[in-house]
């Protein structure tokens, strides 16, 4: 269920400060964050945000289409390696 419009978007304060500082200075270095729950807002456009996936920081370049989504949606936490092959079928 989406967040109420009355409440507005949620973004961690420490991340918001880093974003505003990067926009103000024009810095293009990735912003490291562990805040997967923060929503992408219009001031983040054209910034690279390194989102933690539990093991490493995944660089996410923010575009207009991503506004309203959460940062964690673009940094997958699980790797799918495929199902185990049937050993009997390979021997034939």
From Swiss-Prot:
A GO MF term: rRNA binding
Alphabetical list of Pfam families matching this protein: Ribosomal_S19 (PF00203)
InterPro entries per the UniProt record, alphabetical: Ribosomal_uS19 (IPR002222), Ribosomal_uS19_bac-type (IPR005732), Ribosomal_uS19_CS (IPR020934), Ribosomal_uS19_SF (IPR023575)
Keyword Kinase appears in the UniProt entry: no
Recorded GO CC terms: cytoplasm; small ribosomal subunit
Gene Ontology biological-process entries: ribosomal small subunit assembly; translation
Keywords: Ribonucleoprotein, Ribosomal protein, RNA-binding, rRNA-binding
PROSITE patterns: RIBOSOMAL_S19
Family (UniProt): Belongs to the universal ribosomal protein uS19 family.
Record NCBIfam families: rpsS_bact
Function description: Protein S19 forms a complex with S13 that binds strongly to the 16S ribosomal RNA.
The name this protein goes by in its record: Small ribosomal subunit protein uS19
């Amino acid at each position: 269920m989406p967040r109420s419009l009355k409440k507005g978007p949620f973004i961690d304060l420490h991340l918001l400060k880093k974003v505003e500082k990067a926009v103000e200075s024009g810095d293009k270095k990735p912003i490291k964050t562990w805040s997967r729950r923060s929503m992408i807002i219009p001031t983040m456009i054209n910034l690279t945000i390194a989102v933690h996936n539990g093991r490493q920081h995944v660089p996410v370049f923010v575009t207009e289409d991503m506004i309203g989504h959460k940062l964690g949606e673009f940094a997958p936490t699980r790797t799918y390696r495929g199902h185990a092959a049937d050993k009997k079928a390979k021997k034939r």
